Amino acid sequence: MLDPIHPGEILVEDFMKPLGLSINQLARDLDVPPNRISAIVNGTRSITADTALRLGTYFSVSPETWLGLQLEYDPRLTRQRAGSEIIRRVRVRPAA
């Protein structure tokens, strides 16, 4: 299975680099602290609804797109890191 792609990587590769945007410039334009954008770009912070709305407005992309990327990433990462352990430990409830 391929490694899940963090939305921050998509932000950098598909939006920031083509437009020549730095972390500081994007943070200023979004009216957020630069460390928020830095953490997203570095894959250590999730995209929240607030950030999704800001990114969506700025790049003319729906906020749901940004949230969808995060919602796709989170379970894939969890499955990769702890999936077999979770499946092994959780008791399945029988169907009624």
Regions found by a protein language model. Name each.
Residues 1-21, 68:
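A short, Lys/Arg-rich alpha-helix, primarily the initiator
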Residues 44-57:
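Short, basic-rich loop-to-helix N-cap that marks the start of a DNA-contacting helix
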Residues 31, 42, 71:
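Residue-level detection of the helix-turn-helix DNA-binding "recognition helix"
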Residues 18, 29, 58:
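Residues within the alpha-helical elements of helix-turn-helix
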Residues 57, 65-96:
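Short, charged recognition helix plus adjacent turn
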Residues 21-39:
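Short alpha-helical DNA-recognition segment
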